[in-house]
Amino acid sequence: MNYTDIFLADLDRETPVSRRVLERVPDGHFEWKPHEKSMQLGYLAMMVATMPEWLGMVVGMDELDIAPKDGPKFDPPPLKTSADLVQALDAAAKKGKAALQGTNDAHLAKPWKLLSGGRVIQETPRHVQIRDGVLSHWVHHRGQLTVYLKLLGAKIPSIYGPSGDEKAG
């Protein structure tokens, strides 16, 4: 099995899980955050909805500067409802899947750089960046999102087995 097959299987498994979580994001609470230093619910949910698209950046670009000195700052997409989030996830997963289907192990072994303000903060083979910087990072933020949802009283869907909210009895 090659990297692409593994990552495609991960994407196919994790996308429906993320969809179930995003469907539970309560409209009207997107500016809420559990702590003053935490990110807002809407921003965190937007990340969970759009992170699969990052696969295309890792496959198609040699580097990414997340805070370019003279370049544009990140402008998050205007996602205002759980329906917007689910639609964004479906589009991002489709783009991520296409990027993975268009690459191979030789390309994924090539180096990829993450920069901030022109300074290299990480340089790894693309397959490592996909695993750590995209897929595991995505799952991490989805986990954070479930905590936010629980604090808001939402029922948590099953992730890798039944949740306490979905258990019978």
Question: Over which residues does each language-model region extend?
Answer:
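Short N-terminal signal/transit or membrane-insertion segments
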Residues: 1-2, 48
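Short, contiguous alpha-helical
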Residues: 8-23, 29-73, 114-169
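Helix-adjacent hinge/juxtasegments
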Residues: 57-58, 64-104
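Active-site-proximal loop and beta-strand segments within enzyme catalytic domains
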Residues: 106-114
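Active-site rim elements
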Residues: 3-8, 79-86, 131-135
